[in-house]
């Protein structure tokens, strides 16, 4: 090898070594914390290189914090036992040793930091209330400023809810990269956020946005290997850049990250060194102060500066570059993106079964809270009963904590490791069983009024049980009491369904089943449909659905008797719907008082006639799947994938018809046994007893119900689509945020996944043509993602699973191949009608009656029907919460959903109503939304604001504004000695009157106490007759394990969780780069050497060949010349 070649090789190796060293330094984030000595010469050099940061002196608030997820890569208990307890103990020790140090914990004061796209407003309010109440009870502290820095986008309901809880300022973080870049350049990182146009300033709050993320700035991170000189230089550059992105001179800098400060002493010690250098040189940087601080201190300083500058002239503010107004933002921050291919829209749907179970468990919790509270109130004169019931209060609060826990932004989203989600699923199951027990006991204390009736207190009187399937086998001589609970403040008349099982397929036996309303002794119409006609399906053999129309009083209970009649003279009003096998789905139509529904040959909807308006619309209902290898638990990415048709050709059509229900069931993937891969159930509810010309349709008649049961298909993201032919909606559609509808615009410059938005209750389209004013709404039973990809089309994602990760933190694929049973509800109506009805329909769907069952022969002494309200609430006032807090204080929330005609709302009050029928209450006080003292933000109306029309988010504002509408007035009156605010206001018969006014889209909260009649309380002594006793642990785990999600379900609920602890074999980017840095030059070198060798071999071979040829010629010549 010559000298030149050797030099070249050495050069290549040297470049590789330098490159490798550089890469290692970039990627190494786990160096031990190192202390450095102060070097005055180096510091002088830093100050010479950096100029002044800003003309106006800066106040810098350093926010030490640790973002501790309650479940993500590890479960709740692991995080606490291995990390969190050490963070807390270390921090407390550091704060005790040095009063200058500060630390920020619990962030928003809630039980968790909730997600904002998939958690319902009821659940958000619950988790916030649980945290705020705990802080007040335990530490006597009330949250005023919040730190909501990790949800993946922000809902417009947040400023509305938070401001109603007394929160005045909010720090946010995960705003789309392009939006945040604009906010920085326009100096709009601080702004006023308005949550609702109808509430105006009442829903506004001051918001500050983090520049990058909630972690340490790079150069001052104690885990990063920088010298003191580099730390100071990097920090000063950081604050210079930071100060140029906002109007104010008040800067907030986070010092922390996920689960930081497990060694609090070391973290503070590193920060102490560079902080001292900055503090000693404040004047050189125009720094007024720099210190450890809390969020409260930062916002108070920020507010003071804004108030001070708003009092100055424009000329004075121009000298400091300060605009005299703050930007007013009235939209939301969805979808969240971190790049063109990274739109975080997949988690809107990820883990659909878990999302459904969370919502279902939340409704059960609401029922438990209401019934327990009413049981306490109704037994206020019996000390023994009160004492017994109060033993359930700890269980009740723990169950609320579980509901609060699963609202975390990595649980309800489905973006945790699978074993973590399984842990939360088990917690939900435990809370459900506990709530079954609480409801059972509360029902006993509410309905069993004859305490002296031994027959109702002995062992033969079974408790109220949760029965997912009522087993009527061998029950000819017995009957069941079915008690339905209505959690709504309105009277309910609607269809309900429940499952039964008999011991044989006996039509005569089935037709002998009867349902009787207990209070009227009236036999009511029922319709029975078999769930499966195949006798090979033993798990659901002889399982049937029973349909009925029931009446429930507001917030009340009604009892129905279910039995098999053995009396030949008795004539049950029962219809057994026999199955009819169809060759095609278009052989039949559905009809009820509201709609006529026609189907395609594959059984999916093709045309709907609205009988109220005689409007006929072609509706194309289809299922589709996106195939992709780029998506993950967070991100939905269609790049490189295709959209395919799905569930296009059923194997079997089964039709059932009757007086209450028409149902078409389609089975897919049918084998010789009972297994099917997918099920679709089309259903319409009917009530042939009413005269449509004079009576309103039942609320269940106002939609066409589509049920489906599908498995997760690998690397598929499944949607259901409704396309209304000839509908022009100009790319505008609407989704609800739980409080109100928000306007969305489909951007055709972006891909479909970039146009997805979260849906909590419904998605809808409205016709924009002058000749038509119809609205088309699809209601959902859980949180989903949805969009409108073309005129007249609504696309809803219903399931997704993949064997790839999106590398946004979970570091494991979301392999959810489990079955999801769900329902969607399609409605078409006039826009004005839906203005009155859409929210009520959504609330009815999400607040279905809850049924409990008691098997016994004697109902003596039991109330058969019960309601605590003297009248139902006005049609636009929703009773959102009724629950018992500590010390028997009761919390009440009322929500004005504004579902009334806007033309009449401004001129008339809603119905006047007393609150409770017989229960006496006192200390009726209006509170904040988390039941703490009501506080008003006295600064919010003093800010001068402007709307920036250039802001890059172009949709997400309120659909309607009712800011000028008259509030609804509700008059609550109560007998006796009430101590209500404005207690002097007395009406007839010495009743205390309280008038409450609630604005459209406003939630108002109150606390009160039941009046315990101490002079009437029965003492706890042996002279008292047998008391009702608490029934404990009567629900077996197996019952919950064998629960069916819906009446049509073939398969019990079975989530597919798996053990994904540890590291996933993801692509190692560091190794990849190192291998490229080594492999590329080495590969080139090898190729060059190989080419040289080949060249030399060929050259030698050519030379040798030439020599042989020459030799042959010589030999030939010699041969020719020889004699």
Swiss-Prot record:
Zn(2+) binds at residues 67, 69, 150, 409. Residues 1-21 form the signal peptide. Residues 22-1072 are extracellular. Binds 1 zinc ion per subunit. The active site is at 150 (nucleophile). Its cofactor is Zn(2+). Residues 1094-1123 are cytoplasmic. Pfam families: Alpha-mann_mid (PF09261), Glyco_hydro_38C (PF07748), Glyco_hydro_38N (PF01074). It is found in: Membrane. Its EC number is 3.2.1.24. Belongs to the glycosyl hydrolase 38 family. This is Alpha-mannosidase E. It comes from Dictyostelium discoideum (Social amoeba).
């Amino acid at each position: 090898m010559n000298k030149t070649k050797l030099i070249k090789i050495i050069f290549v190796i040297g470049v590789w070594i330098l490159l490798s060293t550089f890469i290692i330094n970039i990627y190494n984030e786990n160096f031990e914390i190192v202390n450095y000595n102060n070097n005055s010469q180096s510091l002088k050099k830093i100050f010479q290189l950096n100029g002044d940061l800003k003309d106006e002196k800066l106040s810098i608030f350093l926010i030490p914090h640790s973002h501790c997820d309650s479940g993500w890569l590890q479960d709740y208990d692991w995080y606490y036992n291995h990390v969190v307890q050490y963070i807390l103990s270390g921090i407390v020790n550091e704060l005790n040793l040095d009063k200058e140090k500060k630390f920020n914990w619990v962030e928003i004061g809630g039980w968790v930091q909730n997600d904002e796209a998939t958690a319902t407003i009821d659940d958000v309010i619950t988790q916030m209330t649980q945290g705020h109440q705990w802080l007040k009870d335990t530490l006597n502290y009330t949250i005023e400023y919040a730190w909501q820095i990790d949800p993946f986008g922000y809902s417009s309901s947040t400023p509305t809810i938070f401001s109603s809880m007394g929160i005045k300022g909010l720090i946010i973080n995960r705003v789309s990269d392009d939006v945040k870049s604009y906010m920085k350049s326009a100096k709009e990182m601080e702004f006023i956020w308005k949550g609702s146009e109808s509430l105006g300033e009442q829903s506004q709050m001051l918001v500050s946005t983090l520049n990058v993320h909630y972690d340490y700035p790079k150069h001052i991170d104690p885990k990063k290997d920088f010298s003191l000189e580099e730390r100071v230089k990097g920090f000063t550059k950081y604050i210079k850049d930071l100060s140029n992105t906002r109007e104010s001179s008040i800067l907030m800098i986070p010092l922390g990250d996920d689960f930081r400060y497990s060694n609090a002493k070391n973290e503070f010690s590193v920060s102490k060194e560079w902080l001292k250098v900055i503090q000693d040189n404040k004047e050189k940087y125009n720094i007024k102060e720099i210190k450890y601080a809390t969020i409260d201190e930062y916002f108070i300083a920020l507010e003071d500066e804004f108030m001070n500058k708003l009092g100055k002239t424009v000329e004075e503010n121009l000298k400091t570059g300060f605009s005299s107004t703050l930007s007013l933002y009235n939209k939301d921050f969805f979808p969240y993106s971190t790049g063109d291919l990274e739109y975080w829209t997949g988690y809107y749907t990820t883990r659909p079964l878990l999302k459904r179970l969370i919502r279902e468990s939340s409704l059960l919790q609401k029922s438990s809270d209401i019934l327990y509270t009413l049981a306490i109130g109704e037994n206020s004169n019996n000390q023994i009963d009160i004492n017994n019931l109060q033993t359930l209060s700890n269980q009740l609060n723990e169950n609320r904590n579980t509901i609060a826990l699963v609202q975390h932004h990595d649980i309800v989203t489905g973006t945790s490791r699978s074993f973590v989600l399984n842990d939360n699923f088990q917690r939900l199951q435990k809370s459900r069983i506990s709530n079954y027990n609480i409801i059972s006991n509360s029902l006993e204390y509410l309905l069993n009024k004859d305490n002296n009736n031994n027959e109702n207190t002995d062992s033969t009187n079974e408790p109220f049980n949760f029965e997912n399937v009522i087993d009527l086998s061998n029950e000819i001589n017995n009957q069941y009491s079915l008690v339905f609970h209505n959690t709504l403040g309105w009277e309910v008349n609607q269809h309900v369904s429940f499952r039964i099982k008999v011991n044989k397929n006996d039509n005569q036996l089935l037709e002998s089943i009867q349902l009787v309303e207990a209070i009227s002794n009236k036999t009511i119409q029922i319709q029975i449909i078999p769930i499966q006609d195949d006798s090979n399906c033993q798990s659901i053999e002889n399982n049937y659905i029973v349909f009925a129309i029931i009446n429930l009083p507001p917030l009340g209970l009604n009892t129905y008797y279910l039995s098999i009649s053995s009396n030949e003279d008795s004539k049950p009003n029962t219809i057994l719907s026999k199955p009819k096998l169809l060759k095609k789905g278009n052989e039949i139509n559905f009809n009820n008082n509201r709609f006529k529904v026609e189907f395609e040959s594959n059984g999916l909807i093709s045309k709907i006639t609205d009988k109220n308006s005689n409007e006929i619309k072609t509706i194309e209902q289809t299922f589709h799947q996106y195939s992709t290898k780029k998506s993950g638990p967070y991100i939905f990415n269609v790049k490189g994938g295709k959209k395919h048709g799905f569930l296009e050709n059923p194997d079997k059509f089964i039709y059932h018809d009757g007086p209450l229900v028409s149902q078409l069931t389609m089975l897919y993937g049918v084998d010789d046994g009972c297994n099917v891969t997918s099920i679709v159930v089309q259903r319409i509810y009917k009530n042939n007893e009413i005269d449509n010309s004079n009576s309103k349709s039942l609320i269940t008649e106002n939609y066409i119900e589509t049920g489906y049961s599908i498995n997760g298909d690998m690397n598929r993201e499944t949607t259901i689509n409704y396309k209304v032919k000839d509908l022009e909606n100009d790319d505008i559609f609407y989704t609800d945020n739980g409080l109100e509808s928000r306007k969305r615009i489909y951007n055709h410059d972006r891909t479909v996944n970039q146009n997805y938005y979260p849906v909590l209750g419904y998605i809808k389209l409205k016709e924009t043509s002058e000749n038509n004013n119809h609205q088309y709404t699809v209601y959902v039973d859980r949180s989903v993602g949805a969009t409108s990809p073309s005129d007249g089309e609504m696309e809803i994602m219903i399931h997704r699973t993949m064997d790839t990760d999106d590398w946004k933190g979970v570091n494991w694929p979301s392999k959810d191949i489990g079955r999801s049973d769900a329902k969607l509800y399609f409605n078409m109506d006039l826009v004005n009608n839906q203005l009155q009805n859409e929210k009520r329909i959504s609330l009815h769907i999400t607040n279905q009656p809850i049924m409990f069952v008691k098997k016994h022969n004697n109902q003596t002494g039991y109330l058969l029907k019960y309601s605590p309200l003297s009248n139902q609430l006005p049609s636009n006032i929703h009773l959102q919460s009724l629950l018992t807090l500590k010390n028997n204080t009761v919390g009440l929330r009322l929500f004005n959903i504004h579902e009334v005609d806007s033309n009449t709302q401004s001129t008339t009050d809603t119905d006047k109503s007393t609150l409770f029928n017989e229960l006496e209450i006192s200390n009726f006080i209006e509170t904040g939304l988390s039941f703490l003292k009501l506080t008003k933000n006295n600064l919010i109306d003093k800010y001068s604001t402007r709307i920036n029309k250039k802001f890059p988010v172009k949709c997400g504002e309120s659909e309607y504004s009712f800011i000028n509408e008259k509030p609804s007035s509700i008059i609550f009156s109560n007998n006796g000695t009430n101590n209500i605010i404005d207690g002097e206001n007395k009406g007839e018969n010495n009743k205390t009157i309280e008038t409450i006014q609630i604005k459209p889209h406003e939630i108002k909260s109150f606390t009160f106490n039941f009046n315990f009649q101490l002079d009437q309380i029965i003492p706890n002594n042996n002279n008292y007759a047998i008391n009702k006793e608490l029934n404990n642990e009567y629900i077996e785990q197996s019952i919950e394990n064998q629960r069916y999600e819906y009446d049509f379900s073939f398969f019990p609920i079975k989530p597919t969780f798996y053990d994904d602890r540890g590291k996933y074999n993801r692509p190692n980017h560091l190794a990849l780069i190192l291998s490229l840095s080594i492999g590329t030059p080495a590969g080139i070198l090898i190729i060059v050497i190989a080419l040289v060798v080949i060249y030399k071999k060929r050259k030698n071979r050519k030379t040798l060949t030439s020599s042989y040829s020459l030799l042959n010629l010589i030999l030939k010549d010699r041969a020719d010349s020889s004699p």
